Regions:
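Extracellular ligand-binding interfaces
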Residues: 74-157, 176-182
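Extended acidic/polar, glycine-enriched regions
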Residues: 274-338
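Extracellular carbohydrate-recognition regions
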Residues: 25-50
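Extracellular beta-strand elements of beta-rich domains used
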Residues: 34, 140, 169, 184-188, ...
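Aromatic- and carboxylate-lined catalytic core of secreted/periplasmic carbohydrate-active enzymes
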Residues: 229, 246-247, 591-595, 607-752, ...
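Short carbohydrate-recognition loop motifs
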Residues: 57-79
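Active-site mouth of glycoside hydrolases
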Residues: 256, 312, 329-553, 557-565
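Extracellular glycoside hydrolase catalytic/binding regions
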Residues: 478, 485, 499-649, 716-719
Length: 780
């Protein structure tokens, strides 16, 4: 039911939080005339809007249709646009047109609007309208399909969803130079003003792929040979053909197509085929859809493949192909066979994950991931955590219905390309299958849009029924079959993650445990490679779920902002009770859950400390930071990963154990990984933490207030500590080399020699401002 006029007026008053002149006419409702003393409009700036050159917003009498307008100031930089926005719930469903008056002194070429709607704040961006110099009215049709979203892979052709639940309204200016444009009289209209400027028409291509609708029983099935020479531990893609046609090729009850692979030693692998649609780089369907199978041979020699249809029962001619040995291949990631607290490849090499969350892209997906992966790989990174969320790579949402992924083939193809980018750069993907918001009504809630919700045509009255309802479970098993068939063959799939932070949903551990057991059995049926499984909570170590044999390793998430050394050490001990000897990772880390303060912490101290604290407190890799797209990448913080990678290169951590260290001052903390003849040491000043930064900042502000002076530009410099002594115990007596490393400068220092006596090594640090690491190795 639509709101009445006075309800709309109240919403707008809340939006602007200032007196608003609202004029109800037959054809218009004025949203903002900018006649008040203040405005809630703001410039979109980095890190949240890293692609925006917006500078400031100011009320002005210049170029106003009434007494005042608002000036939107920007610069012309390498960023292509300037974003200005207001955030507050608005109902924009009352009229079909959004109009405003704009004066352009000649500093802007185009303008577009963007609306974030619904509980997930889905960003809808319009086509842009060309601007002339001088005064003009600009109009946007709110009901048309000239918008693009992440759901449409940023291709125009979708309408705005949930106009009545608009959370953010933004103007996107395309500058031609430094300056400003002047905005006034923002309004909803039922008819477009004569002579108004409107967006340029965009071409919305008609897909060339024809959806499968009719049915025909299969009488033939065939399999094509590999298009490229097959190599051990390299995934193959084989084409399949059948004359069978079904209404839904994603439903194996309608057409169950599998391929039986037989290895040189007689091992049999039954792999499900999947329905595939190729796309062009412009994300348009490329040719007709069809069947494929993906498989990674683990043995060299002669293999046999044969396609099989279950109903009707048909088999193809057997195909024989040769697989060449691949001595350089490391294989799949496993739990380390010699030390279950770490990971290893099939060939025995240690896998030490260094990376971060790169969960999704809200821009040009492939360009973003190529840039992120290039920068991560160039700095020694080798892991990324990616979500199959509704706005990114999910196969099933309210635009698909349940069990038919036809409308999400673009997302599947994009995820193919992301895997390819990762494989080319030595990056391994933790693939998160379910995000909490999809089944939450409180934290990042998306339940109202979930296709399993009875309100949207599903079968579930409550989110927690997803893990108990038999129909929902069977539909999810169908999705798992498709996911396993399409991506399970990749050796660069590090792990399947069932849920992200499930504690934000109403699903309890008692409900979850049998579901994980059932779904793990299902997924391993479809992918025989032995991939690892994990799961996550918003904290970490307290749940008995970690004891389940179906979960390969445990995860800690932390946004407390506390010192990672103490937080990680405490959580690690907690995992001893719940996870046994399983590996542990810090799967998410941030200073806060709401964002990072770049201006307060330009050195990214929390990112740095998290990366180093995790392995030195026993975790199997560096902590995986969150804010990748609005903090790490726009501020070029990638080199922090290189320091960790350089220091731990070629280290066999399976022979070392996290060990207490004695430090001569309370102003520093030291942690070590130690064996009998080898130790790795990290010493950090306690002044090099975000807590110390915040405390120093607060003191500086108080001092300025007390002195009644203006608080100007401020930058934190950690205090310098002098003559610190560190003692390691438990080493065998003898001569040792000590090689120092600066994690912040990413450089090696001098090598020195010490003598270990009575099992104790004493190291002296003349001065310490941030942190130092060292390798202590016995001289042969």
């Amino acid at each position: 039911m639509r709101r009445g006029f006075f309800q709309l007026l109240l919403a707008f008053l809340l939006l602007l939080a200032v007196p608003v002149w609202v004029r109800a006419q037959a054809t218009a409702i004025v949203l903002d005339d900018f006649e008040a003393k203040t405005t809630r409009w703001q410039p979109g700036k980095a890190p949240t809007y890293q692609d925006s050159s917006a500078q400031k917003v100011a009320l002005t009498t210049e170029h106003a249709t009434g007494t005042q307008a608002v000036a939107l100031h920007f610069t012309k930089t390498e960023t292509p646009k300037a974003i200005f926005l207001v955030e507050q719930p608005i109902d924009l469903s009352q009229a079909p047109m959004l109009e405003f008056d704009l004066f352009n002194p000649g500093t802007a070429a185009e303008v577009a609007i963007a609306l974030s709607t619904g509980s997930s704040w889905e960003w809808h961006e319009s086509a842009s309208a060309p601007l002339k110099q001088g005064a003009q009215t600009v109009a946007f049709d709110l009901t048309g399909n000239q918008y693009k979203t992440a759901r449409s892979n940023w291709a125009f052709g979708v309408p705005v969803a949930k106009l009545a639940e608009t959370q953010r309204l933004a103007l996107i200016i395309i500058p031609t130079g430094d300056g400003a444009v002047y905005l006034d009289n923002l309004r909803l209209t039922t008819t477009m003003t004569t002579g108004a400027v409107t967006p340029k028409a965009v071409v919305i291509p008609t897909p060339t792929a024809t959806p499968v609708r009719t049915t025909k029983a299969a009488t033939t099935v065939a399999i094509a040979p590999p298009p490229t020479p097959a190599r051990q531990y390299r995934a193959l893609t084989l084409g399949l053909t059948t004359d069978g046609v079904v209404a839904n090729p994603f439903d194996p009850a309608q057409l169950d197509l599998q391929v039986r692979f037989t290895s040189p030693t007689g091992k049999i692998f039954l792999i499900p085929a999947f329905w595939y649609q190729a796309f062009t780089p412009q994300l348009q369907p490329d040719g007709a859809p069809g069947w494929q199978v993906r498989f990674t041979p683990t043995e060299a020699g002669s293999w046999r493949a044969q396609a099989e249809l279950t109903q009707p029962k048909l088999t193809s001619k057997a195909l024989t192909f040769s697989v060449a040995a691949n001595a350089k291949a490391r294989g799949f990631v496993r739990v380390h066979p010699e030390n279950a607290r770490y990971f290893a490849f099939d060939n025995g090499d240690l896998y030490f994950p260094i990376g971060l969350n790169i969960a999704w892209s809200t821009g040009d997906v492939l360009k973003d991931y190529e840039r992120w992966f290039d920068r991560l790989s160039a700095n020694g990174g080798n892991v990324a955590r990616i979500w199959m969320a509704s706005w990114s790579f999910a196969l099933e949402w309210n635009d698909t219905g349940l069990g038919d992924y036809s409308n999400r083939m673009k997302q599947a193809w994009l995820l193919d390309q992301v895997f390819k980018l990762a494989e080319e750069r030595g990056i391994y993907i933790m693939l998160t299958l379910l995000n909490h918001g999809a089944f939450s009504t409180s934290v990042n809630p998306e339940w109202a849009d979930n296709p399993y919700n009875v309100a949207t045509g599903g079968m579930l009255k409550r989110p927690d029924e997803f893990v108990t309802n038999s129909e929902a479970k069977e539909l999810f098993k169908r999705r798992l079959r498709y996911i396993a068939a399409r991506w399970g063959s990749s050796p660069h799939l590090f792990a399947w993650e069932w849920w992200n932070e499930i504690n934000w949903t109403p699903i309890t551990d008692a409900q979850l445990e049998p579901w994980i057991a059932e779904m793990t059995e299902t997924l391993t049926t479809y992918e025989p490679y032995g991939h690892l499984f994990t799961h996550s909570y918003a904290s970490g170590s307290g749940s008995p779920i970690w004891q389940m044999p179906e979960l390969s390793f445990a995860q800690q998430h932390d946004y407390s902002g506390s010192d990672p050394i103490s937080v990680f050490a405490g959580a690690y001990q907690g995992f001893d009770k719940t996870a046994g000897d399983k590996p542990r990772l810090v799967g998410e880390l941030g200073n806060t859950a709401s964002g990072e303060n770049w201006e307060l912490d330009p050195e990214a101290i929390h990112l740095h400390n998290g990366l180093w604290a995790a392995p030195f407190t026993g975790y199997a890799g560096g902590a995986m930071y969150w804010w990748w797209d609005n903090y790490i990448d726009p501020n070029n913080l990638w080199s922090h990963f290189k320091g960790l990678a350089d220091f731990f290169a070629d280290e066999d951590l399976t022979r070392l154990t996290a060990t207490p260290v004695t430090v001569s001052t309370k102003e520093a903390t030291a942690v070590a990984l130690q064996g009998e003849e080898h130790a790795l040491l990290w010493v950090r000043s306690n002044g090099y933490t975000v807590q110390a930064v915040q405390e120093a900042y607060d003191q500086a502000v108080r001092a300025a207030l007390k002195a009644k002076r203006k608080f100007t530009e401020w930058r934190y410099e950690p205090p310098v500590l002098s003559t610190i002594t560190v003692m390691l115990t438990g080493l065998q007596d003898g001569a040792y080399t000590v090689r120092w490393y600066s994690p912040t400068a990413r450089s090696w220092g001098k090598e020195e020699r010490i003598q270990v006596k009575n099992g104790t090594a004493t190291l002296t640090i003349p001065s310490l401002q941030r942190d130092l690491a060292a390798k202590v190795v016995r001289v042969p």
